[in-house]
Amino acid sequence: MNEAVKTLDGWFCLHDFRSIDWAAWRELNPGNQELMLNELSHFLSDMEITKNIGEGEHTIYSILGQKADLVFFTLRDSLEALNEVENRFNKLAIADYLLPTYSYISVVELSNYLASHMAGGEDPYQNKGVRARLYPALPPKKHICFYPMSKKRDGADNWYMLPMEERQQLIRDHGLIGRSYAGKVQQIIGGSIGFDDYEWGVTLFSDDALEFKRIVTEMRFDEASARYAEFGSFFIGNLLPSEQLSKLFTI
């Protein structure tokens, strides 16, 4: 049997995509709308406290197109903590008007294709560079791009039949492309084998949305992607600071 990849695992992630039920929202009187938005604001203030003490992260983006209107991206140190956030959000009155359209569960990971190279001989969980990757601070970038992906198991193009050494080299070559976008695109990789329908969830942040097109295009021509990758739907959006939520919901 081929050697299986080992991973270092950090925060658990939930991408929660919602569509606003505008027809139902319009039927509410302004007073009820304000009460619901205030309740949401208190919820987000509590989320900010968790962020400030280093026990998690979160951000909100407005999604373009008809796949969703919003994505709530939350990171926590356990599935229980993540589920608690999800359940509390669903109990908000405004959640009745935010219809689920898609979700993705993963855990921030760094594989031993790369982790040993980054950490050298030390305990990788004590390495500052590794920890920054596993427990990332979400950047307040203007745009987000999320997509799930898997590695192929198709005849001769079967990633899982390749020797470890070949997989390591392909991933390192693939990573060189990502590193060439340092300062332009920040990437968070969530492993989701056994958690969701694909094997990874990829989240990209940038102040220039065209950088998403450039990096994904360039990576498509790399062998690790061209031969061995399969992709799900892509979601793209704009940063939505919590203080601008009321403006979004104003009719």
From Swiss-Prot:
Pathway: Porphyrin-containing compound metabolism; protoheme biosynthesis
NCBIfam families given in the database record: PRK12276.1 (NF008913)
Cofactor note: Fe-coproporphyrin III acts both as a substrate and a redox cofactor.
UniProt function note: Involved in coproporphyrin-dependent heme b biosynthesis. Catalyzes the decarboxylation of Fe-coproporphyrin III (coproheme) to heme b (protoheme IX), the last step of the pathway. The reaction occurs in a stepwise manner with a three-propionate intermediate.
Keywords on record: Heme, Heme biosynthesis, Iron, Metal-binding, Oxidoreductase
Top-tier EC class: oxidoreductase
GO biological process: heme B biosynthetic process
Catalytic activity: Fe-coproporphyrin III + 2 H2O2 + 2 H(+) = heme b + 2 CO2 + 4 H2O; Fe-coproporphyrin III + H2O2 + H(+) = harderoheme III + CO2 + 2 H2O; harderoheme III + H2O2 + H(+) = heme b + CO2 + 2 H2O
Active site, renumbered: 147
Domain of life according to the entry: Bacteria
Entry EC no(s): 1.3.98.5
Family, as annotated: Belongs to the ChdC family. Type 1 subfamily.
Organism ancestry: Bacteria, Bacillati, Bacillota, Bacilli, Bacillales
Annotated binding of Fe-coproporphyrin III, by residue: 133, 147-151, 174, 187, 225
SUPFAM superfamilies recorded: Dimeric alpha+beta barrel
Names of required cofactors: Fe-coproporphyrin III
Protein name: Coproheme decarboxylase
Keyword set includes Oxidoreductase: yes
GO molecular function: heme binding; metal ion binding; oxidoreductase activity, acting on the CH-CH group of donors, oxygen as acceptor; peroxidase activity
